[in-house]
Amino acid sequence: MRHPTLIAAFLFGISSLCSGQTLVEAIEQTLLTNPNIQSSAYNVDAADALRRQAVAGYLPSIDLVLARGLEKSDNTTTRATGDANRNFDRFERSITLNQMLYDGFSTAAFVKQQEAVLSATTQRLATTLENTALRSAQAYLEVLRRDQVVALAQVNLTQHDETLLKIEERFESGVGTKVDVVQTKGRRAQSKSSVLLSEKDAQNGRVEFYRVVGESPRELSLPVRPKGLPETLEQAVQLAFRNNPQVKAAQFDLEASQSARKQLLGGYHPRVDLALGATRNDDMDGSPGANDDETAVIKMSYNLYRGGADRAKMKEAIARINGAEQALIALRRSITQDVSILWNDLEDLSIRIEYLQLHVTSTEEALAVYLEQLAIGRRTLLDVLDIQNELFRARSGLVSAEFQLRLAEYRLLATGGQFLGSMGLTNQRAALTRR
């Protein structure tokens, strides 16, 4: 089958497996192997075949008939010869050509309908591509985020180990207390639990990455901030209305419904055909010898009554047009809601990150002061451990917010049908649309 080649037509290609894996490479790998994309591509092929069937209505149909067998005739011809029950070796050969000349533009409307169906199906494939690429990006970012949380948790555990060692030394030398040792061991156990939990989450993230991408992650790198983000909410909504493939598919669905109605209007017109034919028959209907004909006929057929079926079909077509219009309105409302929520998320995360960064910076400064005060006996090791725990939580919160912001940016681009383009896959996407 040619679908792997089709999908590869709008990808840059898979990079060597021995190198690190960029986000673009992960997306490429996902798009090449995802079965939902393959299924959508087959749907495009099916719609294209329907379009070709519609175009065939412009072309003539040619039929060849060959028939041979025994004939026993008792008619006026055989009775005139005195042989009322004569047997013949009947042989028929005919070829006919039928060319539509006029059908009330039904064929033209049917072709436009199938072209609209093909365009809608292609846009649904584009939707599948955008959504699948977005899931790939989400899995990619999650692996990075969880790995960073593991690193922070391990640093925090190391600090607990160092602090516990110092407190045990102070206790053994008679300076510290047993309570300090017990408290530090408890906090160290909690820190170890955090490491184990973060490692489990990181492993689960790798499992999810494999499910989405089709291979295990390898040396992932933090992607840069995407380009092409809208500057205002109004701009984001308009971009989504103009470029979102779901909206385009709904618009083409409406066009297909309108063309279906125009096709039905052709039923109220006569149909005119050119019929050409030639026959070469032998020993037919009791007449011995050759019986040859050549015909060239223009035929007109005009239905006068079909039990009200045409009127009912027209009502159905109008109802489908109205339904498609309402579906498009509902989709635009949904897109407006999605874009607005994503825009609010972006603004909220941007503000939160500023405060989270301030929290991290302030906690780092506080830790430096605590260490200075520890040196002169104004702070205990447990005090330092407390501020180190707070710094771990602050850094973890900042990491999560930064990755949430990046994912929200990707989602906003995908809602506007621009995510693949922001990844540098614009030419490949255009090749799909022109297909």
Segments predicted by a language model, with ranges:
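Bacterial Sec-pathway N-terminal export signals of envelope proteins
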Residues: 11, 18-67, 73, 100-101, ...
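A short glycine-centered flexible hinge/capping loop motif at secondary-structure junctions
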Residues: 171-175, 374-378, 415
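Bacterial N-terminal signal peptides that target proteins for export
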Residues: 1-7
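Periplasmic alpha-helical coiled-coil/stalk elements that build and connect Gram-negative outer-membrane
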Residues: 128-242, 253, 342-345, 349, ...
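Acidic, low-complexity, intrinsically disordered peripheral segments
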Residues: 7, 397-435
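Transmembrane beta-barrel architecture of outer-membrane proteins
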Residues: 90-92, 138, 183, 271, ...
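Membrane-embedded beta-strand positions in outer-membrane beta-barrel channels/transporters
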Residues: 27, 94-96, 140, 297-299, ...
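Small/polar (Gly/Ser/Thr/Ala-rich) solvent-exposed segments
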Residues: 38, 61-83, 87-88, 98-127, ...
